[in-house]
Amino acid sequence: FLMNFDEIINRKNTHSVKWDMMEELYGVSKENGIPMWVADMDFRPPKCISDSIKKMYDHGIYGYFGDDKDYLKSIHWWLKHRHNWDIDPSWVFTTHGLVNGTSMAIQTYSDPGDGVVLFTPIYYVFFKQIKEGGREVLECPLVNNKGHYELDFEYYDSLMKGNEKVLVLSSPHNPSGRVWTQKELTEIASFAQRHDLVVVSDEIHNDLIMPGYKHIPM
């Protein structure tokens, strides 16, 4: 799993959203700008991953994929090894990514006109997903305590209108980087239970944790 973090790879003019669309989206030249606006790394993946992809490519046939037992086994092993979370592989439902999966969950557990709770600031795409689906965003602002974002459930309780059906949680929190504690996650669960909310937990950054912190799956 060795990686070379010193290798500089030029991704400009490769149809890279991160680099080639900076000017179109933000008016910043890709030649001079620093694209810190999206979570997209410029490092090659570990060789074992590239080799596996190349093996599939070299086979030359790209038909429908099935028989995902190895895939599910790998997910089970990683979550147990990394987070001590012993899942049942039957719980896994594969989507086309975070945005697609979150949209599907919101549409499944709410109806047009219902409210969706967000602890803000949060990943901006969630606002678009909710509004385009005909739902209403209810912002529950995090408290910025000298650069440390905190939750205020007494205030959030007062904001609830009664039509909320879903809480979209970012854990670890994007953009602040907060890793929610066991106590905070328990309070979030209690808040959701009080207001009969389905929690949709975005944990895409769960493996990017600084030393001294522990991610706890929701």
PLM regions with names:
Residues I34, K165-V166, V198:
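Short, Asp-centered acidic motifs that coordinate Mg2+ and/or phosphate
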Residues E203:
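Walker B catalytic acidic pair
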Residues N4-G97, M104:
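N-terminal small-domain helix-loop-helix segment of the aminotransferase-like
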Residues G115, L197-V198:
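Short glycine-centered segments of the SAM/dcSAM-binding site in methyltransferase folds
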Residues Y62-S190, D207-L208, G212-M218:
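Conserved core of the PLP fold type I
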